């Protein structure tokens, strides 16, 4: 009973976080160029489905304060396009800006697009990826949802199946996830990952604010 109450509390806190920052993101007019300066490793932000980069602004601000130049992809908009298309946007951005040694910082679906980009023609431009709450193995809830665009996250979805075969890039990925994710009951552990970081909390969104995320980016930046 106590366990169920704890999960319910996590669920409520998670959606409160999501609603608050989605609302803030809808009205925020911060210029992305304000985060482009810095001498640390360059970071490229990949938000989740129905999220713009502004949803991740608390994390972006914290990373920029630590010296990282931050790059965002306005072309992704709310990241509703197929994973393959999102990965192509990532590759085109890296090529157009001649970026190298980039670390991807991704949330949820953004991690799927990031992994596909790492395996693509521009993969050598990417040093590593920190993926937060990414459904690498899919989610059995996907097919139960009334939105067709979310069915792609089913464990049997073509993109999920394809990504599972791309084992060679896993060693460059750090997967950070909560002990309880209401969206991904299977969890986000990635076989062969550079590191799997399981945080003893619950949530799919508010885990973006966990200090371990910043700590793991720092480790990737140093190595």
Predicted regions: what is each one?
Residues 43-54, 58, 62-172, 176, ...:
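Serine-dependent carboxylesterase/thioesterase catalytic core
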Residues 32-33, 166, 200:
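Hydrophobic alpha-helical segments, principally membrane-spanning helices and signal/leader peptides
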Residues 169-223:
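C-terminal catalytic-base region of ester-bond hydrolases, centering on the histidine
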Residues 1-45, 50-73, 92, 96-99, ...:
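Flexible, membrane-associating and regulatory peripheral segments of lipid-active enzymes
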